[in-house]
Amino acid sequence: MKKADSEQVGGVILQYLREMGLETLLNEHRLIQAWDKVLGPSVSRYTKEIRIYNQVLFVTISSAALRNELMMRRTELVSRLNAEAGAQVITQIVLK
């Protein structure tokens, strides 16, 4: 039997995460996980560190040539990573 005011489990969990202040952390984790999926294994191999601070994604890349190529695609990468994470998590990328 279904109650008239029943909710989907996903909605209840999302509401709980918002109330506990954990939604941002979850979205940041999703975005960091999306780095490998969006950029693939060839870029992941040269990725040394990824972190997010104040909506800025900081990525350390060990290859100067790859870092320069990614710098030219930063705007596109911000859009693709946010889309993969399902939220506006970052506003810019800093490559080191």
Predicted feature residues:
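Short, charged/polar surface micro-motifs in flexible loops or helix N-caps
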Residues: 41, 64-65, 87
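Beta-hairpin (beta-strand-turn-beta-strand) motif
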Residues: 64, 95-96
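A short interface-forming secondary-structure element
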Residues: 54-73
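N-terminal presequence-like segments and adjacent domain-start helices
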Residues: 1-36, 48-50, 75, 85-95
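Short edge beta-strands and adjacent turn/loop segments
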Residues: 34-58
